[in-house]
Amino acid sequence: MENVLKNDWGPLLAPEFEKEYYRKLADFLKEEYSTHVVYPKKEDIFNALEYTSYENTKVVILGQDPYHGPNQAHGLSFSVQPGIKTPPSLLNMYKELRDEYGYDIPNNGYLVKWAEQGVLLLNTVLTVRQGEANSHKGKGWEHFTDRVIELLNEREKPVIFILWGRHAQAKKKLITNTKHHIIESVHPSPLSARRGFFGSKPYSKVNTILANMGEREIDWEIPNL
């Protein structure tokens, strides 16, 4: 898992790939990929950073670890590959979007359109063993993705961090630069969405902040495939 990042994340994150924790993580992943089914595919691990460069990041939506079912994960938090049923949390995200903007719920969960507009869809852990949620927790990815958040925190241009649920909100301690914005609520999971996610209007809050900054707003509508 060497540094394959081709955009501005490459030099920014280069020191991480040389650190002891990352070498141990790379050894662990080499073993995991050769002995188990692991998601996403190796070439998709860093997709969040590939689709959304450092300079172009306007918004961060922080997830936990990748979906662990076949053909779901492709390196973007909450997103699934085309042709795969929309998972429950993402369906609730779409319901909130419908309530905010009147958009129809799309027939897919492929969020590349968001990523291409500057929405960094970052999981805190970037790989998982099939059928075993959190199986790669504590193996080193957290150090790596914390560094991603720290680098964004160091940026002069403001970033909007969307933190849903306690796991994401635990990363608030890394966001110390008062230029940045934090939008938080409970997680869109069916277990918690009715306790404050529905009606929280995260998408229009983002666009209000962007408009006030003179930045292009995010077109949140996901097209049918």
Curated annotation (Swiss-Prot):
Substrates-to-products reaction catalysed: Hydrolyzes single-stranded DNA or mismatched double-stranded DNA and polynucleotides, releasing free uracil
EC number: 3.2.2.27
GO cellular component, one term: cytoplasm
UniProt-recorded name of the protein: Uracil-DNA glycosylase
Main location: cytoplasm
The organism of origin for this protein: Bacillus cereus (strain AH187)
Record keywords: Cytoplasm, DNA damage, DNA repair, Hydrolase
Role played: Excises uracil residues from the DNA which can arise as a result of misincorporation of dUMP residues by DNA polymerase or due to deamination of cytosine.
Annotated active site: D65 (proton acceptor)
